[in-house]
Curated annotation (Swiss-Prot):
A GO MF label: ribonucleoprotein complex binding
Cited Pfam families: BOP1NT, WD40
PROSITE patterns tied to this protein: WD_REPEATS_2, WD_REPEATS_REGION
Protein name according to UniProt: Ribosome biogenesis protein BOP1 homolog
Biological process, per Gene Ontology: maturation of 5.8S rRNA from tricistronic rRNA transcript (SSU-rRNA, 5.8S rRNA, LSU-rRNA); maturation of LSU-rRNA from tricistronic rRNA transcript (SSU-rRNA, 5.8S rRNA, LSU-rRNA)
Predominant cellular place of this UniProt entry's protein: nucleus
Keywords: Nucleus, Repeat, Ribosome biogenesis, rRNA processing, WD repeat
Role of this protein: Required for maturation of ribosomal RNAs and formation of the large ribosomal subunit.
InterPro entries (alphabetical): BOP1/Erb1, BOP1_N_dom, WD40/YVTN_repeat-like_dom_sf, WD40_repeat_dom_sf, WD40_rpt
Gene3D superfamilies, sorted: YVTN repeat-like/Quinoprotein amine dehydrogenase
CC per GO annotation: nucleoplasm; PeBoW complex; preribosome, large subunit precursor
Length: 743
């Protein structure tokens, strides 16, 4: 149907047959030649082979080929008189006019009643070929050419019946030879290749089931009401309301970067001025690949087929893919945020005083690296262990050197016994643990009790006399425990155990009483170990001690428990394969913390089982410190991180602080956290960082960690220790400097 026209008859396909009969009747009455307007297929076939009709005079002529067109070719009749534009004509259904002409005058409707229209359709012989033009409110009669055009369009034919689309096609002169055809020799694909595979069949079946399911669901959905046609604005600018996502998608999109067009130097026959000279070629060859501006030098070829393969094709395509992958797809508003607002609000460090902030003392005399420092329980004396084989004890307040103990080998660690009822200074020296009683550091009764505590069980008669003699000796300030009642002849035959002998090291650790020479030096008891002692720690009561030998070839003997009062030695872990780095006893509960290279294990000493395992994220753990309350602990590692673990929070670090630039070698909590909630970390970058770490009793509050001070040294820091009752910090460095930092 032509646009803008409506047919008077709606009989469908049968209407054209009636129209065909009427036109034939009209043609007979006028005496014209036999013309078939709508020929059937048989008639067209007969006309093609030249068969005449029954009377021999019939002929088949297509509509439009013999009809003489009397219509005028002027375009004035076809001009659009109604100039209302492309609007719905329903807007004028209640008006007396149908629109306006080019001069703005109204075009009035033709008023005809239904009876008049019926009579016109009955009396008019051309009623079957008459259509109504709603735009101009008039009837138009279709010519034979128009009917033939409609007839051709309905059957998907060309609009011009005389047009032959195959007139320019030449006749195929190629003769098919089955014997020489490739497919005739069974070399083509078999029928099996056209059968879909089993997995393809399953995929298709799955898609069919999905479509059927969607169709069934769509039938169950309630039918949506069709919206009425909304009024349209005649002079709208085409603005479309969009949501934020759609507007961002279409208006903030950034086009992908285009490949730059090739330059003249990339031509296969560039001008002579673009060709490089020999000097330029040598300079290009000397440059590195990443420093070259281009990956090739211009060359001249006689023809394009002489151009070789571009060796940098794959790299260029890869770089192009990277450019497309990493190019921003849309414009985004950059958020300008003040970096200070991202930091948590912390109290002013000045409000958290006291804490160590100034250098007050230098404890001189060391000639090598000081690997360990320890403060006595009363805070009066400071012990240091140095690589020059000496253990020195200083008075904290004055810096006076009270005593030096020659151990004969580098000292790995020194530590005072935390119990105030025992006056013991222990030192780790290669394959042994050495116990010294500094008599000047405690009362005589405490010294006597300490000697009996270390030597009481399993002594022979001569050893009891020696112990009694040691107990009767007056202890003077600045002097070590000596045995003056024994003569040189009585001490000459005493056997000494060589701790460096291979056979002796293979034995279990055993307690050994000091020889006369060692007693003169102040050594009371030694414990021979099977491997080099790296670290050790005391229990809070001073009776138990744990020693670590990480380089022992027997893995379960890396951790050794010692009971000093009964001289018992036992290995608590029989099936243990990890390398240990540090250990600590819980200050209040029967728990034992053992740090390995990548975790911290918490053992219950009463139940003899592993209670918890804390994952230390990062590098290899180096040191461990337990909070005096026992619910938190610190772990240092080789990645410059200090991890704060909350046992009530999680098995993972509560805070992970990276304040240093080197390996964290030492860290320690202040023993008196109720008055001084402080902890310090020392690293190989020569800095000691002091933190305020407040732990609350309320479980709804997290621990508060605030950095308050940075204490700088010239060399790596190996040890840190707090004063037991003051906010003083003692540090030791690689160059043998031992300092005291006070508030």
């Amino acid at each position: 149907m032509l646009p803008g026209y409506t047919a008077e008859s709606k009989d469908g396909a049968h209407g054209y047959e009636r129209l065909h009969d009427i036109i034939l009747q009209d043609s007979d009455a006028d005496g014209e030649d036999d013309v078939i307007l709508f020929p059937h297929a048989e008639e067209l076939a007969n006309a093609a082979v030249g068969i005449d009709g029954d009377d021999g005079n019939g002929r088949v002529v297509r509509l439009g080929t013999t009809q003489h067109l009397d219509e005028s070719d002027s375009s004035e009749d076809e001009a659009t008189l109604n100039r209302v534009g492309d609007i719905p004509l329903e807007w004028y259904k209640d008006e007396k006019h149908i629109g306006y002409d080019i001069e703005g005058k109204k075009l009035m409707k033709a008023e005809r009643s239904a009876l008049e229209r019926l009579l016109e359709a009955t009396d008019d012989p051309n009623a079957m070929r008459t259509i109504y033009d709603a735009l101009h409110d008039e009837k138009k009669t279709l010519s034979n050419a128009d009917l033939q055009l409609i007839f051709n369009l309905q059957r998907n034919r060309t609009t011009n019946s005389n047009y032959d689309m195959y007139s320019g096609v030449q006749e195929d002169t190629v003769v098919f030879d089955p014997l020489n055809h490739p497919l005739a020799r069974s070399s083509g694909p078999s029928k099996k290749a056209f059968v879909p595979a089993l997995h393809d069949t399953k995929v298709i079946a799955k898609m069919v089931r999905r479509l059927r399911k969607e169709e069934a669901e769509s039938k169950l959905r309630p039918a949506t009401e069709e919206k009425e046609d909304e009024d349209q604005l005649l002079w709208d600018d085409g603005h479309v309301e969009m949501d934020t996502h759609t507007h961002f998608k279409y208006f903030n999109r950034v086009p992908k970067p285009k490949v730059p067009p090739p330059g003249t130097f990339e031509s296969y026959r560039p001008p002579p001025e673009y060709l490089p000279s020999e000097r330029a070629k040598q300079r290009q060859a000397r440059l590195r690949t990443i420093d070259r501006r281009e990956h090739f030098l211009p060359q001249s070829f006689d023809a394009l087929r002489h151009v070789p393969f571009y060796h940098h094709t794959i790299q260029d395509r890869y770089q192009r893919c990277l450019d497309l992958a990493f190019f921003p797809r849309a414009q985004r508003t950059r958020l300008v945020v003040d970096p200070d607002k991202l930091l948590p609000e912390l109290p002013n460090p000045k409000d958290l005083r006291p804490y160590p902030e100034k250098l007050s003392f230098h404890y001189k005399g060391h000639t090598a690296t000081v690997r360990s420092v320890s403060v006595s329980p009363n805070g009066q004396y400071l012990a240091t262990g140095c690589d020059d084989h000496l253990v020195r004890v200083y008075e904290v307040q004055t810096g006076r050197l009270m005593k030096r103990y020659d151990m004969g080998a580098p000292v790995q660690q020194v530590e005072f016994c935390p119990s105030k009822s025992l006056n013991i200074l222990a030192a780790a020296v290669e394959y042994s643990l050495v116990f010294v009683v500094p008599t000047f550091a405690a009362h005589a009764l405490v010294n006597d009790h300490t000697i009996r505590f270390l030597r009481a069980p399993g002594l022979s008669a001569g050893q009891r006399e020696a112990a009694h003699a040691l107990g009767a000796v007056d202890t003077l300030g600045g002097r070590a425990v000596t045995q003056t009642t024994l003569d040189a002849d009585e001490t000459a035959h005493e056997a000494t155990t060589d701790l460096h002998d291979v056979e002796e090291r293979e034995k279990r650790a055993e307690f050994l009483d000091a020889s006369a020479k060692e007693r003169n030096a102040g050594i009371v008891v030694k414990i021979a170990m099977h491997a080099k002692v790296k670290k050790f720690c005391f229990h809070i009561k001073g009776d138990y001690l744990c020693a670590l030998c990480p380089k022992d070839h027997v893995k379960y003997r890396q951790t050794i428990m010692l009971q000093l009062s009964k001289r018992k030695v036992f290995c608590p872990f029989r099936k243990f394969s990890e390398v240990v780095t540090d250990c600590r006893f819980h200050p209040r509960e029967p728990l034992f913390f053992l740090a390995t290279t990548n975790s911290v294990r918490c053992y219950n000493l009463m139940a003899h089982r592993l209670q918890r395992r804390f994952k230390a994220s990062g590098g290899v753990t180096t040191c461990l410190s337990i909070h005096p309350e026992g619910d938190n602990f610190l772990v240092g590692d080789t990645t410059s991180h200090t991890s704060w673990f909350d046992m009530d929070f999680s098995d993972k670090p509560y805070k992970r602080m990276r304040s240093h630039k080197g390996v964290v070698n030492a860290l320690a909590f202040h023993p008196k956290t109720g008055a001084y909630p402080l902890f310090a970390t020392g690293a190989s970058d020569g800095q000691v960082h002091v933190f305020h770490g407040m732990v609350y009793d309320d479980y709804n509050k997290n621990a508060l960690v605030v950095p308050v001070k940075i204490l700088k040294h010239q060399r790596s820091v190996y040890a840190v220790a707090w004063h037991p009752s003051l906010a003083w910090l003692f540090t030791s460095t690689e160059d043998g400097v031992v300092t005291a930092w006070t508030e």
